[in-house]
Amino acid sequence: MNEQIKDKLKKIPHKPGCYLWKDKNGIVIYVGKAVDLANRIKQYFLKDRDLKTKKLANEICDVDYVVVNNENESLLLENNLIAKYKPKYNMLLRESNAFPYILVTKEEHPRILYSHDSTKKIKGTYYGPFANSNIKKYELYNFINRIFPLRKCNKLPNKKCIYYDIGQCLGPCIKKVTRQDYEPYLKEINDFFSGKSKSIDEQLEKKEIQAAEKLMFEDSQKYLELRKNLKMFSERQDIIFSQKNDEDIIGFYCKENVISIVIFKYVNGSLLSKYDLITVFYSELDEILLTLIYEYYSKIAIELPKTVYLSLSDEKLKTLSESLKIKFLNPSKGVKKDVMDTAFNNAVEIMKNKYLQLISNQNRELNSLEELQKLLDIKDLYRMEIFDNSNIFNTNKVGAMVVYENGVKNKNEYRKFNIKDEDANSDYDYMKEVIYRRYKNNTASFGEIPNLIIVDGGKPQVKAALESLKFLELDSIIPVIGLAKDDKHKTDRIVKWDFSEIKLDKKSDLYFFLLNIQDEVHRFAISFYRNKKSKSLFENSLYKIKNLGKTRIEKLLEKYETLDKIKEASVEELSQIVPIEVAKEIKKL
């Protein structure tokens, strides 16, 4: 502890508030909150502190703090400070749209939609999120959309559509259809998502048998798979409360400085989904629980429950209730206590399965970042942006950018680039264009300026990046390095911005850390290239179909953003854009 901190510790009040630990460069490395600032801050410098806290404390060179009126205010302030400074030791939740939802819109003529958007921009009833990777969610959605005659068209057409002819729509485009007409189907959909799926299973079984009798074995297998999906989905509704309330039940388990949390989400009394998390923390257990739970309900949860059951002190539960406007309770007995015990057991299992790997990975990542920081003599390495290009014979030229924050990839910040310069014919040209376009207008869509740019390649790629940065007057602000390969095409050295080289120890954690980064950007670039190439080949095939001209192809590609979505679309869906005979030809491709 230096003299500056010793002096500040004498002046810190015994009041609630937030504290900010800073390193030797003045960078905020941790934000915490406390009911008593003075007592909490002094705990970091006790002799019997654990290894994780010791690691954090060894980096501390200064502290700032903000006094507030109560714990509720400190919780809100902590959240804002973490968002502002993004400290490397705050292992908080990041919003994710990875898991899909199925949405029934609240329009006059409702539709069933498949969405990854958790912001609820479209008004309606959201079912999900569906995290089970074994469930073929989109196929299940397609089947549900076909058997319930809700509106399929984005806008009502002026004449009847094929969905009305084949019995998949009530036909509001040609006759009066009221909301009451949809009610039986809406109830049946809700029953399905409540686990009452017997009638749908019977329909699938009937189609499976009919397909087998016609020797259409692929179709028969498809219906069998859908039935299995339906069974897996229904099994998630095993725990049902007699009271049809929207409630969450939280269990957690702590081992040293690692916490695992499980949240059971109940909708209308039925268990709909499970959310789990395991993370390292550097504060008191009550503090990190408050922070993580606040983060979850303020940023990640799409539907807020009326009540949350959690084993915490009355004081902490009151703080959460006031902050989130949700009732937080601690059940002492009964079925809610039993389910909380189940959630606790789940949290214990997560800890058993992931603890060692989490600690090992985190230590390697932090150590590798520190080693790279020292090696390059860079002030901070919070954010790194890594670039690669992909093409074959100068066709379907693409660039890709991946982002790492505190040594962890942030997929929400990944970006793809189509090479626009038709005269560009080398990796040097592609890199130059991509770097220029990334930093020309540092808009919010790209995130903040990185602490380091890494390019996949040696001196030519580093030179290309530096040229674009120099043109933008950023060459003295953002350092650039390249990951270069030897004669055997194996990465073996770092090429710095001054073109000096640093040989890498192929047995070191840093080497494997950089190799993983390089593999990630290469994978991302290659997948983008393959998709673009496949799309190009698919487009060429489309042009060979009779009565399918440029305008119709453009409309197809406008509605179905990816090739997979075109392939998944039924003949009936495609026939909304092209004649039905043309739609059948497309399905043959």
UniProtKB/Swiss-Prot annotation:
Pfam families: GIY-YIG, UvrC_RNaseH, UvrC_RNaseH_dom. Keywords: Cytoplasm, DNA damage, DNA excision, DNA repair, Excision nuclease, SOS response. One of its GO terms (cellular component) is excinuclease repair complex. It is found in: Cytoplasm. The keyword Cytoplasm applies. Its main location: cytoplasm. InterPro entries: GIY-YIG_endonuc, GIY-YIG_endonuc_sf, GIY-YIG_UvrC_Cho, RuvA_2-like, UvrABC_protein_C, UvrC, UvrC_RNase_H_dom, UvrC_RNase_H_dom_sf. Belongs to the UvrC family. It comes from the Bacteria. The UvrABC repair system catalyzes the recognition and processing of DNA lesions. UvrC both incises the 5' and 3' sides of the lesion. The N-terminal half is responsible for the 3' incision and the C-terminal half is responsible for the 5' incision. SUPFAM superfamilies: GIY-YIG endonuclease, RuvA domain 2-like. Interacts with UvrB in an incision complex. GO terms for molecular function: DNA binding; excinuclease ABC activity. One of its GO terms (biological process) is nucleotide-excision repair. This is UvrABC system protein C. Residues 14-91 form the GIY-YIG domain.
